[in-house]
UniProtKB/Swiss-Prot annotation:
3-methyl-2-oxobutanoate binds at residues 41-42, 80, 110. It holds the Pfam family Pantoate_transf. GO terms for biological process: pantothenate biosynthetic process. GO terms for cellular component: cytoplasm. Belongs to the PanB family. One of its GO terms (molecular function) is magnesium ion binding. Its main location: cytoplasm. The gene is panB. It comes from Deinococcus geothermalis (strain DSM 11300 / CIP 105573 / AG-3a). Mg(2+) binds at residues 41, 80, 112. Pathway: Cofactor biosynthesis; (R)-pantothenate biosynthesis; (R)-pantoate from 3-methyl-2-oxobutanoate: step 1/2. This is 3-methyl-2-oxobutanoate hydroxymethyltransferase. The active site is at residue 180. PANTHER family: 3-METHYL-2-OXOBUTANOATE HYDROXYMETHYLTRANSFERASE.
Length: 273
């Protein structure tokens, strides 16, 4: 049975979240029993081939989220609001969030940062019944302004900014906060200070949940190993080897065999000559 926001906030075990971007990935995640699925704007990197998440559009997110919902009808679904969809004012943000919920069947939206403008958006969405997941630490949508894709919160100013941002997101109405690429001790402090669940990615074991990117945990891209992710399979290698085996058999006329071919009666064939 799909969990509700109160279920997630009161969970006694660590929450398990994984990204999915399409129907088969969503089916895998739901069958595995995860608590939440995130349709992340990371699809720009791992699915669409962009070098950042910035080019991802709202239409991209809706297209992929609809497929994910069809594959996982019984799992709590969170959809990222991509860059630019909540940065031009509360009215635009509300319109875009409503569109995501209506057109995808998502249960919540996620956005990055804790600036006063973002906090206003979180508050308006939450007060109007749209659950919001926050995100502090490394924020891929604005990573250039943070000095690139690197660990945040290592010095006092950055650590304090991350802590205060998480607290502000909770106060604004976020039901959960993602902590990305921050020291484990800082993540533990934030988790202890918040009443809503923290979900970590590269933030240590003391968060109240964890999230990994589907392609990272399955090893779909050979050689693309990240410190904040663990590979639980090497499907990229298996896929490459399988396609190479198929190519060899085709070129050697070993595929298809009789097992993959259909028959025709001799008398029917004879009438065609």
């Amino acid at each position: 049975m799909k969990r509700s926001v109160p279920d997630l906030m009161n969970a006694s075990e660590p929450l398990v979240m994984v990204t999915a971007y399409d129907y088969p990935g969503a089916r895998h995640a739901e069958a595995a029993g995860v608590d939440l699925i995130l349709v992340g704007d990371s699809l720009g990197n791992v699915v669409l081939g962009y070098d950042s998440t910035a080019p991802v559009t709202l239409d991209d997110m809706i297209h992929h989220a609809r497929a994910v919902r069809r594959g996982a009808p019984n799992t709590f679904l969170v959809v990222d609001l991509p860059f630019g969809t909540y940065h031009t004012g509360v009215t635009d943000a509300m319109r875009n969030a409503v569109r995501v919920i209506q057109q995808t069947g998502a249960d919540a939206v996620k956005l990055e940062g804790a600036t006063p403008e973002v906090l206003d958006v979180v508050g308006v969405l939450a007060r109007n019944g749209i659950p919001v997941m926050g995100h502090v630490g490394l924020m891929p949508q604005t990573a250039t302004a943070q000095g690139g894709l690197k660990v945040q919160g290592r010095d006092e100013a950055s650590a304090r900014r991350t802590l205060e941002g998480a607290l502000a997101l909770e106060a604004a109405g976020a039901f959960s906060v993602v902590l990305e690429a921050i020291p484990a001790r800082l993540a533990r402090l934030i988790t202890e200070r918040l009443h809503v669940p923290t979900i970590g990615i590269g933030a240590g074991v003391h968060c109240r949940g964890q999230v990994l990117v589907y392609h990272d945990l399955l090893g779909l891209y050979e050689g693309d190993e990240k410190k904040l992710a663990k590979r639980y399979a090497e499907l990229g290698k298996e896929a490459r080897e399988a396609i190479a085996a198929y190519a060899r058999e085709v070129r050697a006329r070993e595929f298809p065999t009789k097992d993959q071919s259909f028959v025709m009666k001799d008398d029917v064939l004879g009438k065609l000559y």
